Amino acid sequence: MRKGNTANARECALSVLVACRRNGAWADAALKAQLGKCALSAQDAALCSRIVYGVMQNELLLNWYLSAYCTQKLDHLQPPLSDILRIGAYQILFLDKVPDHAAVSESVELCRTNGRSAASGLVNAVLRKVAQNKSNLPPLPEGNFARLSVAYSHPQWLVKKLVSLLSVEEAEAFLRIDNEASPISVQVNPLKTNEKALVDELRGEGVCVTPHPWVPGCLELSGTGDLTTLSAFYNGRFTVQDAAAHLIVCAADFARGQRVLDVCAAPGGKSFAAAFAMENEGRILSCDLHENKLKRIREGAQRLGITCIETAAVDGRAFREEWAGRFDVVICDVPCSGLGIIRKKPDIRYKDAQDFSALPEIQRAILENSARYVKRGGLLVYSTCTILPEENEQVTDDFLKAHDEFTYEAFSLPNGVSAPGHLTLWPQRDNTDGFYLSRMRRKTHD
């Protein structure tokens, strides 16, 4: 691997894409690991990240155009040739600052450095055709589902689902946002600072800061570089969390001195939000299956100056008798398909619908078990980062049908919207991640 130039960034990007395709690795984890090995400059690391996420966000569209100029089917090419072609085509079609000739020549070089010199002529010819025709590319397929699927690189099953839930026009708006860069959203830590002071501090460190348009204490950042190098992060004056997830505070109605159970707590954002709202007074029990994730929660709490959080390694489906009826608020942020956060994790879109088929059963089991921990008069909060009804309102509706000791209870959002016990947030409507949130009250007498 060559050092100190943008070609090195391309080699690094190729390694990430190959790891994702060959090993099923998640892009964010694979990218972080690869950047740790490559020792790239900040500029090259940014280019590497842009290529990785850009190729993933546009894979079906890139395949469509490449297939028009390649004499062989892309999936018949020896690995990693298809990814080399996508890397080159992405730069030609989407990165104005990269000259076409550089995108072509460096892609040819990737062939040579990855044992595919014999295919360098094919890669050169295909990418030159893409560059020559980029103002006159092949038309997209006809029909709304096929067109939207290729144009925004989402599988047709998901496009059809979105159209059934929204409309063709609004589904397209959702898909468009999925392919945009996701803002880095952080929450102010009121135990250590306030919004104005944090904004001033971050701007003083050269960070571009925009307060969220309607979620108090939520800031959107850009130009941060590595967040962990910021003094404000090191000193615990903010935590990373999307605006939608922070709205758990609205549904949970936390108060000082409460006992709160966070059933599926990792990576800890909702437990931290609870601690902020409770002014660090009370008890929060944060649970997860894996001790390594609990360790990160404890480290985060220490950084933020939170002392009311304890952790426990627990399966959310396994009943703990000693917790029965003991908690004022129980939070169930259950494992889900993640289809509301595709702009953060673009590789989620390429999952098959069948990959998610077992989730509602798991979600129901966690909700059923967690409800047993809510004291009479207490709150049960259920949330996901997906937009699929079968993981959202269908789960909570079915739960309430089977448990008349619980009922939906209305709550309000900071933008004035009143939710009749549950709601779905949409990125194209609400400037948040896609997110489902519900609030259920246990009756004082069962």
Predicted regions and their residues:
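S-adenosylmethionine
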Residues: 1-446
